[in-house]
Amino acid sequence: MNDSPKISVVVLAAGRSTRMGTSKLSLPWADTSVIGSVCQKFHANGVENIIVVLGGYAEEVHNALRRLEFYRNITIRVNADPIHTEMIDSMRIGLTGISNESSHVFIALGDNPQVSKEVITEMIDLRKSAPIIIPSFQMRRGHPWLVSRALLGSLLAVPAGKTMRDWLNEHAAEITYLKADRSVLMDLDTPQDYNADNLA
């Protein structure tokens, strides 16, 4: 895909899996792991600059990533204090690893392997329609998000106490929504979530 757009993805994978009780991102999923499945779908879409932010269970998740054929395309960043920081802090850490050539950056959840490769493809196709592309289901925002490089400065400047969703609300006029299925709202928090979705 030499003519593919230059896009990075920051995969947020620093959570502590408290409700799962184990390293959920390294659990089996399809022919790989939960985190592996997430990364595979971006790689299959030509996203070659993949930044994964680790935190809780960092070694287990890193080992799962090492088993991917395209591991050389993955940059590891670590949130050293996942207990006392928020998702937006992990995002900032991840953005330090994006390629200088990238025109857009996906912000993705490491525990959302349900999202299809096709949703990501459609988001990439829409990238020129607005600075922010968000998949939605029944009027609810989902993940991943696709953000133009031009907005990364304001995203990095979100003040303490504010969230990534606060930032989206402030930039509502710059969002194009992609209608998708409910998978864009899903994640894996409990053993019940994992068993239901992995066997579906």
Which functions belong to the PLM regions below?
Residues I35-H104, E118:
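Conserved N-terminal catalytic core of the sugar/cofactor nucleotidyltransferase
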Residues N2-P5, P159-A200:
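Conserved alpha/beta core of the MobA/IspD/sugar-nucleotide pyrophosphorylase nucleotidyltransferase superfamily
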Residues A30, G56-Y57, P82, E86, ...:
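Short beta->alpha linker loops
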Residues D3-Y57:
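N-terminal glycine-rich phosphate-binding loop and ensuing alpha1 helix
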Residues P28, Q114, L146, D187-L188:
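Short aromatic/basic micro-patch
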Residues M20, V61-L65, M123, L155, ...:
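Hydrophobic packing residues within well-ordered alpha-helices of enzyme cores
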Residues N73-I76, I132, I175:
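Short, conserved active-site loop motifs that form the nucleotide-linked donor/cofactor pocket
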Residues I83-R149, G153-L156:
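Conserved beta-loop-beta/alpha segment of the NTase-like Rossmann-fold superfamily
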